[in-house]
UniProtKB/Swiss-Prot annotation:
The modification Phosphohistidine is found at residue 79. It comes from the Eukaryota. Disruption phenotype: Dwarf, wide leaf and small grain phenotypes. This is Histidine-containing phosphotransfer protein 1. InterPro entries: AHP1-5/YPD1, HPT_dom_sf, Sig_transdc_His_kin_Hpt_dom. CDD domains: HPT. Two-component system major event consists of a His-to-Asp phosphorelay between a sensor histidine kinase (HK) and a response regulator (RR). In plants, the His-to-Asp phosphorelay involves an additional intermediate named Histidine-containing phosphotransfer protein (HPt). This multistep phosphorelay consists of a His-Asp-His-Asp sequential transfer of a phosphate group between first a His and an Asp of the HK protein, followed by the transfer to a conserved His of the HPt protein and finally the transfer to an Asp in the receiver domain of the RR protein. GO terms for cellular component: cytoplasm; cytosol; nucleus. Plant silencing simultaneously OHP1 and OHP2 exhibit phenotypes for a deficiency in cytokinin signaling, including dwarfism with reduced internode lengths, enhanced lateral root growth, early leaf senescence, and reduced tiller numbers and fertility. GO terms for molecular function: histidine phosphotransfer kinase activity; protein histidine kinase binding.
């Protein structure tokens, strides 16, 4: 497929992610930091976010399965996820983390479990779209041979 068609697909995907509220302006700020000196900057940051997010969500599940939940520890993990979400512009995940932290402060296991399900769904939805975005970027780069 031609680079122009792939670029069009990529732009449509990213625009859709903004329209769905998955991303906010912070993602555009990230994109502006990418240039010829750091051509893989966005993909590196997004990959790190996806890896960290998956690790944190697994840890949150483990913590909330314990008979005596350490809500301060859970809150610390949610705070990490909120921070990394904010840094990549993952608006829905970040906003759900804000709700999650409120349940941690209330010491509500049920609230935390329900919000964990929501944050998991939103995170994996975003991760899948990020993976599609990165694949399109790789296909576009493959259209231009390196000298």
């Amino acid at each position: 497929m031609a680079a122009a068609a792939l670029t069009s697909q990529l732009n449509a995907l990213v625009n859709n992610m903004f329209a769905m509220g998955l991303l906010d302006d912070q993602f555009q700020q990230l994109q502006m930091l990418q240039d010829s000196t750091a051509p893989d900057f966005v993909s590196e940051v997004v990959t790190l976010f996806c890896d960290d997010g998956e690790r944190i969500i697994c840890e949150l599940s483990r913590q909330l399965e314990k008979p005596n939940v350490d809500f301060d520890r859970v809150d610390s993990y949610v705070h990490q996820l909120k921070g990394s979400s904010a840094s990549v512009g993952a608006q829905k995940v970040k906003n759900t983390c804000i709700q999650f932290r409120e349940f941690c402060q209330q010491r509500s296991r049920d609230g935390c479990l329900k919000t964990l399900d929501l944050v998991r769904t939103e995170f994996y939805d975003l991760r899948n779209k990020f993976q599609a975005m990165l694949q399109l970027e790789q296909q576009i780069q493959a259209c231009y041979p390196k000298h």
